[in-house]
């Protein structure tokens, strides 16, 4: 059996004390800005915003894009992926998965595209990266947005680039069950401000 170990108490208390002493606990305070800058460097991205959780990263990204219609996604994911789509008044259209990677089978996307399709929301699963080149080729061909659910691939790279640098946006979860966690939290990396 392997036990988990909490961070060193004194170090943790120093971090908490410095936040308390600054009188700035949230909303772009010094620790927030420091984490954002460190994550940009670590993930190899230009833009990142921190949010309360991965679900809000997905939901607010879709809302910011002001999309209408259908979003092609996968049913092989946590419910938040589909919930974010539905909560934005969009219709999820499910694409089957590749049996080897458990990621969306890119070869099945085009036959699901209709005149109502506005975006593709692939999910990188269990550290497996989606077929980025094919997904982005299809998105470019049909002028669709691509929002990656990257909750399972924090810190991964693809062809030397951070996984958060692909698509129009990539969303991460920092839930306690994820590779990198802050007990709760999330982030969205994006190209255009």
Language-model segments: residues:
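PLP-dependent aminotransferase-like
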Residues: 63-150, 157
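Short, small-residue-biased leader/transition segments that mark boundaries at the very start
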Residues: 1-8
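Phosphate-binding glycine-rich loop
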Residues: 28-70, 76, 83-88, 94-96, ...
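Short beta-strand-to-turn element immediately C-terminal to the catalytic PLP-Schiff-base lysine
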Residues: 172-173, 187-192
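Structured loop/turn residues at beta-strand edges in well-structured enzyme cores
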Residues: 2, 43, 66, 115, ...
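Conserved active-site segment immediately N-terminal to the catalytic lysine
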Residues: 148-182
């Amino acid at each position: 059996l392997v036990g988990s170990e909490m961070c060193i108490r004194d170090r943790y208390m120093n971090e908490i004390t410095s936040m308390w002493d600054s009188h700035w606990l949230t909303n772009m305070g010094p620790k927030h800005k420091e984490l954002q800058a460190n994550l940009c460097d670590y993930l190899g991205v230009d833009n990142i915003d921190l949010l309360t959780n991965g679900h809000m990263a997905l939901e607010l990204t879709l809302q910011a894009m002001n999309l209408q219609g259908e979003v092609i996604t996968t049913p092989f994911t946590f419910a938040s992926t589909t919930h974010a789509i539905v909560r934005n008044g969009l219709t999820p259209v499910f694409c089957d998965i590749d049996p080897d990677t458990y990621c969306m089978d890119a070869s099945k996307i085009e036959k699901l595209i209709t005149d109502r399709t506005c975006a593709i929301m692939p999910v990188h699963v269990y550290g497996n990266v989606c077929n980025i080149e094919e997904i982005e080729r299809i998105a470019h061909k049909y002028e669709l947005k691509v929002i990656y659910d990257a909750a399972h691939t924090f810190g991964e790279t693809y062809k030397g680039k951070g996984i958060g640098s692909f698509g129009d946006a990539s969303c991460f979860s920092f839930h306690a069950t994820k590779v990198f966690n802050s007990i709760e939290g999330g982030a969205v990396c994006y190209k255009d401000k």
